[in-house]
């Protein structure tokens, strides 16, 4: 049913949910709290101007063995979350392990716990083109994949704006292939 809603656009608002995947755990650890706050403010402000309601950020590489805290901001009405876990399977296991005993686990509630509010529209992969984040299987299922050829430390709100502008030019296929109607 959820797939049908996605495919038909039923219940879809004009807001956009973006996943950004970039940097390594070590690069994330080198950022100070002030640097994270400044970065999130720039991302949130740019996202707000583009009708984005949620930006979820994951590292592209590194070891999950060194703990890094989940960071959350609300900037200009945009929920920005930096979730420092490379391994999507471990992230799923952690969410399931921490599931409240009285809360029914459905596809919708599990999805919200894993990726935040709303369906993911676009996945921006930061760094050299062609790097597919295998840990983001859940996020890649129906989100449009866009490579951003900049270094993680240099990714800014302007880059996010470019991602959203490119996303808006695409014909959404929701996991399907483009069919050439002229043949």
Where are these regions (language model features)?
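Flexible, compositionally biased loop and terminal segments
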Residues: 1-183
């Amino acid at each position: 049913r959820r797939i049908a809603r996605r495919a038909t656009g039923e219940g879809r608002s004009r807001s956009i949910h973006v996943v950004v995947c970039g940097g390594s755990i070590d690069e994330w650890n080198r950022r100070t709290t002030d640097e994270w706050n400044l970065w999130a403010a720039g991302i949130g402000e740019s996202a707000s101007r583009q009708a984005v309601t949620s930006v979820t950020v994951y590292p592209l590489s590194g070891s999950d063995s060194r703990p890094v805290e989940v960071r959350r901001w609300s900037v200009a009405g945009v929920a920005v979350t930096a979730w420092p876990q490379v391994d999507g399977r471990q992230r799923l296991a952690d969410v399931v392990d921490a599931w409240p005993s009285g809360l029914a686990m459905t596809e919708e509630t599990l999805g919200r716990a894993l990726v935040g509010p709303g369906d993911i529209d676009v996945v921006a992969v930061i760094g050299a083109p062609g790097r597919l984040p295998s840990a983001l299987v859940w996020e890649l299922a129906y989100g449009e994949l866009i490579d951003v050829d900049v270094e993680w430390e240099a990714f800014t709100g302007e880059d996010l704006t470019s991602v959203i502008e490119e996303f808006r030019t695409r014909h959404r296929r929701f996991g399907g292939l483009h069919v050439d109607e002229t043949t």
